[in-house]
Amino acid sequence: MIRFTPFRQRKGYAAAVLFLIAFLSGCGNDIHPVEGQVVWKGGALAKELEGSHVVFELPEKKTSARGIIQADGTFRLSTHKPNDGAPAGEHKVLILEDRKNANAEGTLLAPALLDPRFADLKKSGLTATVKPGANTITLTVERAQAR
């Protein structure tokens, strides 16, 4: 039978407190505000992509941050809570286009506006560096080819 003496109890409490401090110091401190805009090749704001999702993937931390493109072509990223930002590091970026309905019944999608390669992390070619502090990022994309 193991008896817990006051010394062992204090040692256990101290270890628990140190673990908790170490755990909490590593959580949440690496999220930094990120806002940005999506522009078409040539510089025009990609306002037509309103409602589409911007996704920042940080492979080494196996985490992602997401934002929704607004009517003015801008976005703000969220990781844990709304608009908190993204972890620092070199991110791979993709954009998931929100394709609108082409008819009132919602049975036909409008043609894609965005080149489909931007929906694939391996093909998009988009990267962004998030640094400690506030970040402003511009993502340049290309239109889908007319078929």
Model-inferred region functions:
Residues 27-147:
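Beta-strand-dominated extracellular/periplasmic modules and repeats
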